[in-house]
């Protein structure tokens, strides 16, 4: 029997909303199933061999999916409410605790919109694909439904299934349409991600069966089970590994440069724009929200790992002469700010982490699309073989410049706001000592300084370096076409809009973030040592890690 509601509400004692808003129309189920059903129709679309009809059909499905998610946001989602909305629940196998439960709150709704938006643009970016177009667009649409499901489902076993569903399309998109080392990159991707997913399954089963009785895997139930501290720490560690691979966290990152190095432009957009955000979202949803006591223990480790991401990846990006790998390491560096924000106990810092995921999704997709467009013309990714093409590709240079400025966090762009929020949120987070905050913000600032250096030097080498006469004289070296300008324009509109008026995005999730931070702060205050005895009790760790009792729970979101 279908009923638009979920099981027991969150316990108010944990500062989780005590009521859930049921859906009046199954928007989220439709947004998940529509692209998947569309994918299975793709093989039956009449085609003359060039893939034209298939491309238009796939674009129609992707755009309709985006309109469905937009309608869900506009008609059924209230940004001022912190709890679960658009909730649907279908009893599936009750004896096994399996339920089709979907819903959206401030953590998931912005990322659902981001997923459908970038997928629609990725389909448009895939217009030149003529090799096995039916299979290509089948995989893109199936991946769209799977990624939306990751953000929308409210059952941990369903989450695991959705997490696995998007792995196979990515593997095939890399293995069939990738570069010369595509088999290696695809195999490495599947080994890393599928192997780490085992930790999600084990944690889900352990948490669902905890306490005996009929198992239940719904997030609302798991959040109220009252796990023991040791159990939480064990589950948290396993989930951190699984989600750390996807984010990625150094040293679990090595699959990403290889995958980006061999992927095509539309696959780049999906990897950078959506796939990495799944890791950040899952850390917030499970590690921070459902396992708050363990999160209070692990939070300083997340902060340190975030700084390592920022500095290590930025320095590594300097050494890269391959354009795709350079941007890939830049992505890893920027995701370090997400870790710092999640590890903070302030609303401002955590809100900054959320905004950084959205911002990087847009900026990363734009940069990797431009990498693909440039490669289509130059047929090389080596910076040493480029140079002097700015005179023949002036519009392309302008697009590259604006997107690089967005990536280096130029004021007026979304990246500036998100990184500033993380910096300010952590600097005012009284859960940590002043000296620790100064050290972390100071080290993270190094990454902010390094980013414009390697990005602007990259621009110079591509467009104004030593001229490659053979490359410059090549007939393929033409300027950007209207389709490419349109795609970048669509990405720049929200990048600049959020940069000029952040409330366009922050208002959609600020109340959910407030509830999440209050829950984590409450957990911190209830354990013996306010923060992270797992890390801070050892004498081998400097006193900079010790923390006083929290006196101020949160900071306002700007």
From Swiss-Prot:
Protein name per UniProt: NAD(P)H-quinone oxidoreductase chain 4
Protein localization: Cellular thylakoid membrane
Main localisation: membrane
Topological type in the membrane: Multi-pass membrane protein
Top enzyme class: translocase
Catalytic activity: a plastoquinone + NADH + (n+1) H(+)(in) = a plastoquinol + NAD(+) + n H(+)(out); a plastoquinone + NADPH + (n+1) H(+)(in) = a plastoquinol + NADP(+) + n H(+)(out)
Source organism of the structure: Synechococcus sp. (strain CC9311)
Keyword Zinc-finger attributed: no
Function as written in the Swiss-Prot or TrEMBL entry: NDH-1 shuttles electrons from NAD(P)H, via FMN and iron-sulfur (Fe-S) centers, to quinones in the respiratory chain. The immediate electron acceptor for the enzyme in this species is believed to be plastoquinone. Couples the redox reaction to proton translocation (for every two electrons transferred, four hydrogen ions are translocated across the cytoplasmic membrane), and thus conserves the redox energy in a proton gradient.
GO CC terms of this entry: plasma membrane-derived thylakoid membrane
GO molecular function, one term: NADH dehydrogenase (ubiquinone) activity
InterPro entries registered for this protein in UniProt: NADH_Q_OxRdtase_chain4 (IPR022997), NADH_Q_OxRdtase_chainM/4 (IPR010227), NADH_UbQ_OxRdtase (IPR003918), ND/Mrp_TM (IPR001750)
Keywords: Membrane, NAD, NADP, Plastoquinone, Quinone, Thylakoid, Translocase, Transmembrane, Transmembrane helix
Transmembrane segments: 25-45, 56-76, 90-110, 111-131, 133-153, 157-177, 189-209, 230-250, 264-284, 298-318, 327-347, 353-373, 397-417, 438-458, 485-505
Any Pfam family: Proton_antipo_M
Entry EC number(s): 7.1.1.-
Single biological process term from Gene Ontology: ATP synthesis coupled electron transport
Similarity field: Belongs to the complex I subunit 4 family.
